[in-house]
């Protein structure tokens, strides 16, 4: 039973598309738009007896056949869909109109529309009269016959088709049985206009035995298996299209050079075009190659027939369609397996083009003579290409972000002009590069280098180039040095991780570091899902005479959704800097782990407010103002924490996440002021006491949930000015070496004048026997002391705590928690 789709009582625009649906208008003035969007073989009915209604036939609509009654018309479209308009004599037929695009067509009455369709007068009664076959809408007019620009589907029988002045399309299939419609005895004459034969090689190859004349475009699709099509010197062809092939397609027998289009060919499926009898091959022979969303591992070969040594010299590649285009290689050869004939490779279009295999040009370099030119001057989408080593290549970029890979072959006669955008030149296969000895580099921002495995990588003379960034790619040898020590002011450096090895010492410096505000930016590009955390590491970052170091934590993006998270992270094992370094700024969306060495004695600022994911930082020097990011941050002070340091959280204040500070202290004093700590917004503060007793003040500690104390040295600690609600952890530090306490712990509140003051001690013993053996001391002004034991405190497990509470002077002592199995 057909589905009825009712309009509203207003003026509606309806676009019939679905099978077995009756579209019915109500009282408004309704518009029904008929277009090629109607599903193939769909059965659609239109009924509307009220209002001033119209049928719009969109430009390009192809009607294979029609039948007219006195008050109804049946239109069979070229895709087999059948549209029946009941009460047709009450409709206006607007040819070429389309309200959805604001296009106005030509209005015709029902009888006028019938006349245009080849029915001179409408029948009466129940008589049906057929209109002219193969009618197409062209602009605001409708004409009959193949010559009007129709689409014709070939039959399994004999087809003798003659076109007219329009742009006609003929659809055929090389199939089996009833699916074989392109037969050797068929005859197609496209006539005038720009005509197309669309051929689907679904079950076999095309041998070229159909008689085809006056057809300008051969559009061929390979499916089911790799297919071949031999055009047998078919004359008049100007364009060859590989139309959405799902398998390899090889086309031969072209007697002249044609434009080649690849339209959404399946990734990994290849296109090979052979031009025959090309006596006209010669200097300057060119081909236009249009790519519409081609695949990254597809191969494209344009070649002459066997024995040909000349071929395509200039290739003009355009990127059209809705997405970027890629190819494994694009080659122009004299013959199959022969030498390249290419001298120029041009790219245009708004979409990015990527070709992974180097563009090969004819001949080899001879002195200063240019072998090949790659020009992306007309490209706005950017290119990612490679040049063959040993050829003198000129590369010109466009307005997009372009990259050109010269591998080992960038010599003094090569040149790169990146144009606008952020452009990259890539070099590899050497241990060092002196930029002053290489080819010309202009309008190019990034130099990417990967040194030969087995040694370090060095870039010199950066001060002589207009480049602004060096990106080092780690080679395949572990702990190798990376060096760039003569950078210009404003230059930056990137480290790209791409395997299980990691760089050793990275030495960076400025050519002129005599200023008092020199800065350097280092971007770390880690691998997502690296084999191990250390695989995104740098053993040592060595800098000198740099006042400000900017670190950006990033990821090598291949899929667009990578992020270095909890088990990963960019790591700098040691930042070795001299006394010039005063500021480190860190930013990024990927986890960062770093240690600042003891050499950086002048460091005063560590600003990680730009970090949106977790960080772990270790400081070996003191008197540093630290700002944390919005992730879960861990800040290790070592033995340097005093009142001269300050820590401020950058915004992570949720209940399920936490920042943490760790520090080892000895001899801090609230009397001298060294123990007056300045910490804001950090949830956990882990303190380990060694050597000498300390006293610290929490008066300037805000936003914390716990101060956790650990020590096995029987060293006393006094914590003063504790705000209400702040828990004191005893043996509750996160680090395994600090999850114990053996000593006297004295705690007092900032305000003990209330009537219900409480201090809570949390026992978090998780180590070996008797790890917590502490004496607790509180003032009598505190009404209650609560001792909460963690759930793993059970004597049977050799895991318990012993407390001396004789100096807890509170009126009420509450003990709770512990393991449920432990009873005493």
Report the location of each language-model feature.
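Solvent-exposed, low-complexity segments and loops of surface/extracellular structural proteins
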Residues: 1-824
């Amino acid at each position: 039973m057909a589905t009825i789709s009712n309009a509203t009582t207003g003026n509606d625009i309806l676009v019939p598309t679905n099978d077995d649906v009756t579209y019915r208008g109500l009282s408004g003035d309704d518009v029904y738009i008929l277009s090629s969007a109607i599903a193939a073989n769909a059965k659609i009915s239109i009924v509307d007896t009220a209002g001033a209604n119209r049928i719009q036939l969109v430009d390009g609509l192809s009607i294979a056949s029609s039948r007219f009654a006195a008050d109804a018309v049946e239109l069979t479209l070229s895709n087999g869909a059948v549209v029946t308009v009941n009460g047709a004599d009450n409709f206006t037929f607007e040819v070429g109109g389309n309200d959805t695009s604001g296009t106005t067509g030509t209005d015709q009455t029902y009888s006028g529309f019938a006349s245009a369709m080849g029915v001179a007068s409408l029948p009466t009664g129940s008589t049906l009269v057929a209109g002219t076959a193969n009618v197409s809408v062209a602009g605001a007019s409708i004409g009959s016959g193949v010559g009007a620009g129709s689409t014709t589907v070939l039959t399994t029988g004999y087809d003798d088709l003659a076109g007219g002045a329009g742009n006609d399309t003929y659809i055929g299939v090389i199939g089996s049985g009833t699916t074989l419609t392109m037969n050797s005895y068929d005859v197609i004459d496209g006539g005038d206009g720009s005509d197309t034969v669309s051929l689907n090689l679904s079950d076999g190859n095309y041998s070229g035995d159909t008689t085809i004349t006056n057809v300008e475009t051969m559009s061929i699709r390979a499916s089911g298996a790799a297919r071949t099509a031999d055009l047998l010197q078919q004359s008049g062809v100007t364009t060859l299209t590989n139309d959405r092939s799902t398998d390899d397609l090889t086309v031969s027998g072209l007697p002249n050079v044609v434009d080649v289009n690849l339209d959404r060919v399946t990734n990994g499926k290849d296109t090979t075009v052979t031009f025959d009898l090309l006596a006209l091959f010669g200097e300057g022979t060119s081909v236009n190659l249009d790519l519409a969303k081609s695949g990254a591992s597809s191969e494209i070969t344009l070649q002459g027939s066997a024995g040909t040594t000349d071929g395509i010299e200039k290739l003009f590649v355009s990127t059209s369609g809705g997405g970027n285009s890629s190819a494994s290689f694009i080659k122009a050869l004299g013959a199959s397996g022969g030498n390249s004939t290419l001298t120029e490779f041009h790219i245009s279009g708004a979409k990015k083009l990527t070709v992974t295999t180097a563009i090969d040009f004819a001949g080899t370099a001879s002195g200063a003579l240019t072998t090949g030119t790659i020009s992306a001057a007309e490209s706005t989408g950017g290119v990612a290409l490679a040049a063959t080593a040993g050829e003198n290549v000129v590369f010109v970029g466009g307005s997009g972000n372009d990259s050109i890979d010269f591998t080992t072959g960038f010599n003094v006669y090569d040149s790169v002009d990146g144009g606008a955008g952020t452009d990259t030149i890539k070099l590899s296969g050497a241990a060092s590069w002196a930029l002053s000895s290489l080819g010309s580099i202009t309008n190019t921002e990034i130099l990417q280098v990967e040194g030969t495995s087995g040694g370090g990588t060095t870039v010199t003379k950066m001060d002589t180039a207009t480049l602004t960034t060096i990106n080092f790619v780690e080679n395949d040898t572990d702990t190798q040095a990376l060096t760039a020590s003569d950078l210009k002011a404003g230059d930056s450096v990137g480290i790209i991780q791409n395997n299980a090895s990691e760089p050793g010492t990275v030495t960076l410096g400025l050519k002129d570091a005599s200023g008092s505000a020199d800065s350097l930016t280092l971007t770390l590009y880690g691998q997502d899902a690296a084999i191990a955390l250390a695989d995104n590491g740098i053993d040592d970052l060595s800098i000198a005479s740099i006042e400000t170091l900017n670190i950006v934590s990033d990821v090598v993006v291949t899929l667009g959704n990578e992020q270095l998270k909890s088990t990963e992270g960019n790591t700098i094992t040691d930042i070795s800097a001299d006394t010039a370094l005063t500021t480190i700024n860190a930013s990024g969306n990927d986890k960062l782990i770093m240690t600042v060495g003891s050499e950086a004695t002048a460091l005063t600022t560590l600003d990680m407010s730009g970090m949106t994911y977790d960080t772990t930082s270790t400081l070996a020097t003191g008197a540093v103002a630290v700002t944390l990011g919005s992730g879960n941050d861990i800040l290790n002070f070592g033995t340097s924490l005093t009142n001269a340091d300050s820590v401020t959280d950058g915004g992570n204040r949720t209940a399920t996440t936490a920042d943490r500070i760790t520090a080892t202290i000895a001899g801090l004093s609230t009397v001298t002021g060294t123990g007056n700590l300045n910490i804001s917004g950090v949830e956990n503060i882990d303190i380990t006491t060694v050597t000498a007793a300390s006293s610290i003040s929490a008066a300037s500690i805000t936003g914390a949930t716990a101060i956790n104390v650990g020590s096995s040295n029987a060293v006393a600690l006094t914590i003063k000015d504790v705000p209400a609600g702040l828990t004191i952890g005893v043996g509750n530090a996160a680090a395994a070496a600090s999850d114990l306490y053996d000593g006297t712990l004295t705690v007092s509140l900032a305000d003990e004048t209330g009537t219900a003051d409480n201090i809570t001690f949390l026992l978090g013993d998780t180590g070996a026997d008797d790890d917590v053996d502490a004496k607790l001391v509180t003032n009598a002004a505190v009404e209650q002391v609560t001792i909460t034991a963690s759930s793993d405190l059970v004597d049977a497990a050799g895991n318990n705590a012993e407390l001396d509470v004789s100096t807890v002077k509170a009126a009420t002592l509450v003990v709770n928690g512990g393991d449920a199995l432990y009873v005493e």
